[in-house]
């Protein structure tokens, strides 16, 4: 609550109120975390214990200690400053560099990214979000819940979500499968290819396939897949046009 009060004061100093038309503002019209830290620090240094206050000096001190790293310390490079996204028509978030970071830092950055995606998918609309190597985020149940909510609601805003992962078993881990199982029943369009060495029963149960449907992709065939759309099923052969095949190259993805 104290942080909320301080943020309101900071916004008021910058001329931002409930009456402000935020659609007319750019990223640099907003204050940064270092400015928030400076405001709280000034409040702490000038604290008058002789007057009645909504908070104590000790509480302000604890807030400063908790925020220091992300406002002025080593984590400030991730959180303090204005966004460098000038055109959001095509944005790639490379998260490889933070996968080895502490869990708290990684989760905070992931929450920022998912919040941005949520706004584009569900508020702006007509947006496609692709999540590659999704197994890396399955340990964060908040992220899984975010994505599940995306997938349930994006169609209403003409948006779409694409999820890619290495192995289906990653979604079946204890403590996770209760959240991930709905992800396979939500998509309107599904392209299902041969599952490789995955157990057939597990594959059919997870993706809710009939035995006859599974038999169409039981054996490895390049480009052959089962396409599901509502109650319709098609056995497809997927071929890349020549002009797109050139974009893929011949180095096996390297």
Predicted features and spans:
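Short secondary-structure boundary/capping segments
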Residues: 12, 17-24, 145, 177-180, ...
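Conserved ATP-driven motor cores of ASCE-family P-loop NTPases powering translocation/secretion/packaging/pilus
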Residues: 141-142, 146-236
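Short, surface-exposed polybasic-aromatic patches that bind anionic ligands, especially phosphate groups
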Residues: 239-240, 249
């Amino acid at each position: 609550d104290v942080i909320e009060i301080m943020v309101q004061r900071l916004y008021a100093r910058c001329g931002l109120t409930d009456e402000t038309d935020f659609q007319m503002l750019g990223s640099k019209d907003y204050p940064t975390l270092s400015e928030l830290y400076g405001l709280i620090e000034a409040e702490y240094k000038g604290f008058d214990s002789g007057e009645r206050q909504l908070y104590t000096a000790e509480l302000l001190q604890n807030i400063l200690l908790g925020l220091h790293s992300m406002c002025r310390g080593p984590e400030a490079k991730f959180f303090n400053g204005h966004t460098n996204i000038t055109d959001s028509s095509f944005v790639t978030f490379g998260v490889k560099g933070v996968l080895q970071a502490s869990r708290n830092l990684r989760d905070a950055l992931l929450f920022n990214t998912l919040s941005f995606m949520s706004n584009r998918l569900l508020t702006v609309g007509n947006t496609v979000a692709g999540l590659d190597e999704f197994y890396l985020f399955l340990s964060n149940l908040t992220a899984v819940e975010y994505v599940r909510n995306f997938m349930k609601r994006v169609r209403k805003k003409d948006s779409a979500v694409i999820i890619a992962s290495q192995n289906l078993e990653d979604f079946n881990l204890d403590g996770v499968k209760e959240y991930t199982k709905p992800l396979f029943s939500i998509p309107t369009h599904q392209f299902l290819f041969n599952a490789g060495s995955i157990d057939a029963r597990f594959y059919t149960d997870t993706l809710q396939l009939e035995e006859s449907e599974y038999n169409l992709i039981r054996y490895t065939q390049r480009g052959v897949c089962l396409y599901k759309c509502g109650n319709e099923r098609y056995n497809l052969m997927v071929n890349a046009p020549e002009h797109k095949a050139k974009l893929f190259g011949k180095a096996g993805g390297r």
